[in-house]
């Protein structure tokens, strides 16, 4: 019998490792409460007042039972009196207390609903704002579905904690204190019996919540893994079907789902035991108090009357209920702390370091041929450096890119680029060729500082790019990435993403330059056609054309074209190339392409192999050398010529 092939796991559900736990739960709890308190201090004070009023109303109602029996019912029965005026007045006062309690409960619920949603809004705002500052490496090493789970599942656990658990815990704590004081006043001896049972309930709660807590952390982790896998499979569904890997995908999902079931089952098994266990212990406490209290009342011991016993037993039940609620709410708090740990882990990720001081500004040329800053768009840009004395130096942006002895690795211990030296002068077209994994795309990612180098230097118009603010550096570059991404919005809005201040006419001109205008006119609503789901209603070639138009509308001095025409048919490529030639005129352009047409007319071709530049020169020079480029050209490139 043939051995079953091993399933290679490609999703985010790798090794699960040891069971995680909440680190510094007290610190996480205080961070959550700071989010609530900093914005809603007055509202939370109002909630506390409402809870106190509600508890006092409940306690007053229970104490009324003792007066009702001892002061009204028993005397009325003994005297055979028909005067119920005193009883009616007492009932009216108690009813007023209950009405106040109802109003307080209603007000508390309304206020907490507003506080909860406002706090979560602020939390999501801070999460998203911080996420925009994170380096690309963070998104490289974390599954996107797992990040989405932080925004949805983990923040939802905080919603339950803020809206329900925190008010209920405070309510129950106030209730326990108030009830205990009242019980001691009624019968210290019975209170001692009750406290012994309360101790047993607390021990049970500690055991159950301790076990459920560690599994809740695992549950949130496994839930993130499941979401990450689903998101990955949705994006790669065509690849799954092409290679007929549906069964393997189902098997991987089942493994992740089984892990989630295991952690969630154990977490909720312990959590759900808390309520029934404490309820039965509470019933036992009630029975013991009733038996002992009945004997004391019948014997007239300790001044315990029938009315006091009735009130005490009601308090006993009232005490058991908040303790059970505390047990149940602790589970929600522990789950929220597990979610909060993941939320704050994202918020504590170190933002992208940007120590640049040089800014990109609109400039104009003066009569003496010097340049200065202007608020108007002049199609002339300059790098602005502010000196210590407050004066500013301006250097015209030309698009001069120089690499000097650059080493780079995605991980410090694994260098993928070695001693890279290159330069691109204004108006030059530099092409990178080489086999897959040679480092072509990596070089372009270093120009826009998606990643920082380990050794060497990169200069832009003579300025070390680490001295230039990243936002200004990237604003000076027009980039068509290998992975085209379109946003939900109209065609025109997607083109305008290259420069948000661009007019409709400028966007249409950019589309025409990229030769995208022809297919846009054929769309149902032309430029106003809505694109959704990363432009799935367009072909891959059409999506690439829009990406090129988006780069064109930015009108940058430097272009980076990473596989820019790899998804366009030969006929469309010729049209695009005509537009791109006009766009590239006078600009430094770096091209990574597999098609001969985008490489052959380059001013300089760099051949990379295993992270090193092994050949450089024009097409004719490299062909004459009959080296690596000659092999590529006569092989792969010749097939596409």
Where are these regions (language model features)?
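ABC-type nucleotide-binding domain
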Residues: 80, 363-641
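An intracellular "coupling" helix at the cytosolic face of ABC transporter transmembrane type-1 domains
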Residues: 136-137, 153-162, 166, 170, ...
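Helix-loop-helix
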Residues: 75, 182-196, 266, 270-342, ...
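Transmembrane helices of ABC transporter permease
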Residues: 43-56, 164-218, 291-304, 321
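Juxtamembrane helix-loop junctions of ABC transporter transmembrane domains
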Residues: 17-25, 57-73, 97-144, 148-152, ...
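Membrane-integrated ABC transporters
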Residues: 1-58, 73-92, 108-112, 116, ...
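Helix-loop junctions and hydrophobic alpha-helical segments within the transmembrane domains
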Residues: 127, 131, 240, 343, ...
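Hydrophobic alpha-helical transmembrane segments of ABC transporter permease domains
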Residues: 30, 104, 108, 116, ...
């Amino acid at each position: 019998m043939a051995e079953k092939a091993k399933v290679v796991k490609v999703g985010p559900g790798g090794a699960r490792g040891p069971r995680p736990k909440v680190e510094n739960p007290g610190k996480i709890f205080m961070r959550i409460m700071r989010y609530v308190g900093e914005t809603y201090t007055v509202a939370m004070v109002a909630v506390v007042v409402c809870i106190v009023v509600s508890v006092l109303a409940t306690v007053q109602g229970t104490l009324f039972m003792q007066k009702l029996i001892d002061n009204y019912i028993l005397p009325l029965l003994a005297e055979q009196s028909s005067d119920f005026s005193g009883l009616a007045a007492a009932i009216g006062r108690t009813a007023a207390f209950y009405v106040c309690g109802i109003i307080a409960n209603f007000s508390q619920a309304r206020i907490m609903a507003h506080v909860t949603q406002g706090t979560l809004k602020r939390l999501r705002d801070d999460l998203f704002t911080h996420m925009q500052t994170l380096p690309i490496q963070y998104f490289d090493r974390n599954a996107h579905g797992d990040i989405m789970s932080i925004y949805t599942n983990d923040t939802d656990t905080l919603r339950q904690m803020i809206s329900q658990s925190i008010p209920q815990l405070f309510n129950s704590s106030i209730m326990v204190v108030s009830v205990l004081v009242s019980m001691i006043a009624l019968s210290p001896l019975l209170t001692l019996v009750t406290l012994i049972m309360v101790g047993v309930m607390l021990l049970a709660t500690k055991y159950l919540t301790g076990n459920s807590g560690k599994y809740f952390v695992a549950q949130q982790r496994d839930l993130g893994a499941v979401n990450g896998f689903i998101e990955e499979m949705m994006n790669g569904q065509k690849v799954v079907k092409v290679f007929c890997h549906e069964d393997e995908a189902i098997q991987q999902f089942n493994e992740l789902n089984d892990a989630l079931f295991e952690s969630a089952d154990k977490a909720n098994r312990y959590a759900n035991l808390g309520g029934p266990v404490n309820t039965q212990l509470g019933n036992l406490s009630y029975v013991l108090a009733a038996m002992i209290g009945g004997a004391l009342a019948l014997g007239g011991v300790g001044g315990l009357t029938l009315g006091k016993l009735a009130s005490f037993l009601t308090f006993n039940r009232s005490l058991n209920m908040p303790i059970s609620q505390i047990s149940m709410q602790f589970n929600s708090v522990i789950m929220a702390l597990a979610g909060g740990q993941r939320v704050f882990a994202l918020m504590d990720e170190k933002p992208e370091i940007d120590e640049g001081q040089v800014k990109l500004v609109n400039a104009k040329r003066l009569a003496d041929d010097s340049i200065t800053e202007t608020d108007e768009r002049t199609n002339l840009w300059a790098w602005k450096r502010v000196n210590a004395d407050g004066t500013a130096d301006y250097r015209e942006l030309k698009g001069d890119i120089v690499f000097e002895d650059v080493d780079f690795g995605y991980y410090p211990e694994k260098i993928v680029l070695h001693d890279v030296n290159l330069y691109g002068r204004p108006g030059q077209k530099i092409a990178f060729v080489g086999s897959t994994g040679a480092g072509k795309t990596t070089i372009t990612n270093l120009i826009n500082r998606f990643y920082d180098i380990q050794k060497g230097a990169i200069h832009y118009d003579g300025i070390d790019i680490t001295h230039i603010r990243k936002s200004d550096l990237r604003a000076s570059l027009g980039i068509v990435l290998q992975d085209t991404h379109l946003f939900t919005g109209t065609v025109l809005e997607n083109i305008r993403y290259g420069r948000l201040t661009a007019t409709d006419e400028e966007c249409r001109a950019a589309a025409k330059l990229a030769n995208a205008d022809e297919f846009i006119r054929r769309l149902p609503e032309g430029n106003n056609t809505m694109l959704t789901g990363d432009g799935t209603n367009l072909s891959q070639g059409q999506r690439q054309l829009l990406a090129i138009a988006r780069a064109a509308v930015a009108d940058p001095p430097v272009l980076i074209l990473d596989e820019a025409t790899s998804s366009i048919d030969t006929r469309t490529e010729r049209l695009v190339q005509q537009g791109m030639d006009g766009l590239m005129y006078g600009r430094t352009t770096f091209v990574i392409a597999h098609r001969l047409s985008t490489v052959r007319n380059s001013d300089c071709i760099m051949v990379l192999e295993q992270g090193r530049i092994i050949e450089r020169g024009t097409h004719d020079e490299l062909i004459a050398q009959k080296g690596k480029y000659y092999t590529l050209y006569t092989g792969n490139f010749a097939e596409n010529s």
